């Protein structure tokens, strides 16, 4: 019966929300800094025979043959953190302010189904989950390597996943995000996080976590990166750069991403330092990992799965590990994105830092990131006034989840 239900769900999903076809097969695909050249459909001897009747491939066949297999393998190895249910309750804050900050649906669910606290983040945790996905894939690059694919280094993979288990003791659990959000960002349990609060929580939790050690540089809700401030965060006692996650909270327009920033936004996912983008959908956050032409590929956290136990030894079952990945492609046109987002880059050493700055400065179009020697530099350079007209600093008062 269960198998029949799953089959029915897949059939309904196919017609209601079909997977995208590669309708720009001549364009390369990028996934977190890796380029996948256009794939060539298999040759058909009948196509060279004028006497043979023409055959039109069906949608399923076209979809199977036109996405590069290497890209599908890479996409399917990106860690996907979604809504979870039945985890250890997150206590509710019983104040009028906390209650009013929740949506009606979350308020009713918490009162009727979770009177002792939140045992699921469905309806309010998608920005946290997108931020967790960005951070988890940052650790994947650091600990497993950018060339890692599923089926390799299973023990190390499991230990990485355990850090994001839905339990108060896990270093990067939703429980700890919510606690830090309440302490440092004024976010109540059950309240939507925005990119700014999520970035701040990532920074605080990374600072408190000794293994693996990761430094985090925040731009404090602007698109400006200051080299002296970055050095203060990234340099060790010997003056060498340690692995540092740069988180840029920005707004690239008013209601939609301004076309002048399309090139810069696409390019951000082609840099080898890219670890993705969190946010970017009206009233819903996603985790963007790839780009092709004017479309971005993303992982959608709006699927509720059973919570995983915290196992520091990393002994997870295959089924539990599988719940952190998906092979289902999703994409969106840049014009349909929400302009508020959190953009992440991982700089591992001096060469990475020099290469990243060079790429930022040479990207065509209106820049989405500005690099300056110092915050106290009196003149931010030509074009700064125009940039301020379009790129707005994030304000949690109008952030989306």
Curated annotation (Swiss-Prot):
The active site is at 126 (nucleophile), 300, 302. It is found in: Cytoplasm; Nucleus; Preautophagosomal structure. GO terms for biological process: aggrephagy; autophagosome assembly; mitophagy; piecemeal microautophagy of the nucleus; protein processing; protein transport. It holds the Pfam family Peptidase_C54. Residues 45-65 have a biased composition (Polar residues). Its EC number is 3.4.22.-. GO terms for cellular component: nucleus; phagophore assembly site. It catalyses: [protein]-C-terminal L-amino acid-glycyl-phosphatidylethanolamide + H2O = [protein]-C-terminal L-amino acid-glycine + a 1,2-diacyl-sn-glycero-3-phosphoethanolamine. One of its GO terms (molecular function) is protein-phosphatidylethanolamide deconjugating activity. InterPro entries: Papain-like_cys_pep_sf, Peptidase_C54, Peptidase_C54_cat. Its main location: cytoplasm. It comes from the Eukaryota. The keyword Hydrolase applies. It is an enzyme of class 3 (hydrolase). Residues 37-65 are annotated as: Disordered. Keywords: Autophagy, Cytoplasm, Hydrolase, Nucleus, Protease, Protein transport, Thiol protease, Transport. Belongs to the peptidase C54 family. Cysteine protease that plays a key role in cytoplasm to vacuole transport (Cvt) and autophagy by mediating both proteolytic activation and delipidation of ATG8. Required for selective autophagic degradation of the nucleus (nucleophagy) as well as for mitophagy which contributes to regulate mitochondrial quantity and quality by eliminating the mitochondria to a basal level to fulfill cellular energy requirements and preventing excess ROS production. The protease activity is required for proteolytic activation of ATG8: cleaves the C-terminal amino acid of ATG8 to reveal a C-terminal glycine. This is Probable cysteine protease atg4. It comes from Penicillium rubens (strain ATCC 28089 / DSM 1075 / NRRL 1951 / Wisconsin 54-1255).
């Amino acid at each position: 019966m269960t198998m029949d239900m799953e089959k029915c769900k897949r059939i309904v999903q196919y017609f209601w929300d079909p997977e995208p076809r590669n309708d720009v097969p001549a364009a390369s695909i990028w996934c977190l800094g890796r380029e996948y050249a256009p794939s060539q459909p298999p040759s058909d001897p009948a196509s060279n025979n004028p006497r043979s009747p023409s055959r039109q491939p069906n949608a399923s066949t076209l979809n199977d043959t036109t996405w590069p297999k290497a890209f599908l393998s890479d996409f399917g190895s990106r860690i996907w953190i979604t809504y979870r249910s039945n985890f250890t309750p997150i206590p509710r804050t019983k104040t009028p302010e906390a209650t009013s900050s929740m949506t009606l649906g979350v308020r009713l669910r918490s009162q009727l189904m979770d009177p002792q606290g939140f045992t699921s983040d469905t309806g309010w945790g998608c920005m946290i989950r997108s931020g967790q996905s960005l951070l988890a894939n940052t650790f994947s690059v650091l600990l497993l390597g950018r060339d890692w694919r599923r089926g390799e280094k299973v023990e190390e993979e499991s230990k990485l996943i355990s850090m994001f288990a839905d339990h108060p003791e896990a270093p990067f659990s939703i429980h700890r995000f919510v606690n830090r959000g309440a302490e440092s960002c004024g976010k109540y349990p059950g309240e939507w996080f925005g990119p700014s609060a999520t970035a701040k929580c990532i920074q605080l939790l990374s600072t408190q976590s000794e293994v693996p050690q990761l430094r985090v540089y925040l731009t404090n809700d602007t698109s400006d990166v200051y080299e002296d401030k970055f050095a203060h965060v990234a340099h060790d006692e010997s003056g060498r750069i340690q692995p540092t996650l740069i988180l840029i909270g920005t707004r690239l327009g008013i209601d939609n991403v301004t076309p002048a920033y399309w090139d810069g936004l696409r390019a951000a996912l082609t840099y080898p330092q890219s670890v993705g983008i969190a946010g970017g959908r009206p009233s819903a956050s996603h985790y963007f990992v790839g780009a092709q032409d004017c479309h971005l590929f993303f992982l959608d956290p709006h699927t509720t799965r059973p919570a995983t136990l915290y196992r520091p030894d990393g002994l997870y079952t295959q089924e539990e590990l599988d719940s952190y990945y998906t092979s289902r492609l999703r994409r969106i046109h840049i014009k349909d994105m929400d302009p508020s987002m959190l953009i992440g880059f991982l700089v591992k050493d001096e060469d990475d830092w020099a290469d990243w700055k060079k790429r930022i400065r040479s990207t065509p179009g209106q820049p989405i990131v500005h690099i300056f020697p110092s915050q106290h530099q009196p003149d931010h350079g030509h074009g700064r006034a125009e940039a301020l007209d379009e790129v707005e600093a994030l304000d949690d008062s109008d952030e989306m989840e």
